[in-house]
Amino acid sequence: MKKLLTLLLAMLLLAGCAGNKPGTFEAGKNTFLLNGKPFIVKAAEVHYPRIPREYWEHRIEMCKALGMNTLCLYVFWNLHEETPGNYDFTGNKDIAAFCKLAQKHGMYVIVRPGPYVCAEWEMGGLPWWLLKNDSVELRTLDPYYMERVGMFMHEVGKQLEDLQITRGGNIIMVQVENEYGSYATDKPYVSAIRDTVRAAGFTEVPLFQCDWSSNFLNNGLDDLIWTVNFGTGADIDKQFAKLREVRPETPL
């Protein structure tokens, strides 16, 4: 009996490891490729801090039951760094635990670390204490702002970089900034945020940016995947057609 239990335990451990094998995710011609095969991203937006941790698994199961295969996660800066230099990724703020729970249910994750996330959240996720610096210019190349962004992104990377699909995790893409074209035109700033995201360790999965079709040309970077936003009631074909004009082979 003891040998049988040992064998069963070994089989379970091996099965768990098999589910966490390193993989690949990339943008191919007109489609995303998961481990080299066409993959349609069906994503649900889930805000982990708005859900009590004891209900996380239930919400993930609900998303999967709706036919989703991916979860999009904003990372709320002012949640994780309520005061300067004091980072908290525990309890209901444990985004890594949420990602692992999603993987348990066969779900992939798209990380959207901002630094600005909007999401009908206070200051779009930017910490209030940034404003204690009277001269700070948010969402610009302001030295103080960029320094604090870099420090926060580094902490996010420490939590999540090992969960990239290439390392056996379930993170398949990471977003750079958020709808910046609705705020300003500043490619150097968007480029700097891209570099900050990469410096945080997100170098093994595609990076992308999202904007409205009316302004995605303003800050579009050639080395990022472009995605287009549109509201309820929009002509979807028309919106995608605008993206196809400038990126004819981009995945939709």
Where do the protein language model's features map onto the residues?
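Acidic-and-aromatic substrate-binding clefts and catalytic sites of carbohydrate-active enzymes
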Residues: Y48-E54, H80-E81, G85-T90, G181-A184, ...
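Glycoside hydrolase catalytic-domain groove-lining segments
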Residues: L217-L252
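Hydrophobic faces of well-ordered beta-strands that scaffold small-molecule active sites
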Residues: V41-A44, N69-L73, V109-P113, I172-V176, ...
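Active-site-adjacent "subsite" loops/lids of carbohydrate-active enzymes
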Residues: V117-K158
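Sec-dependent N-terminal signal peptides
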Residues: L4-L14
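Active-site neighborhood of glycoside hydrolase catalytic domains
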Residues: Y144-D223
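Aromatic-lined substrate-binding rim segments of carbohydrate-active enzymes
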Residues: W56-E122, W128, R194-V205, D223
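N-terminal carbohydrate-binding accessory modules
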Residues: C17-T70, K100, K104-Y108
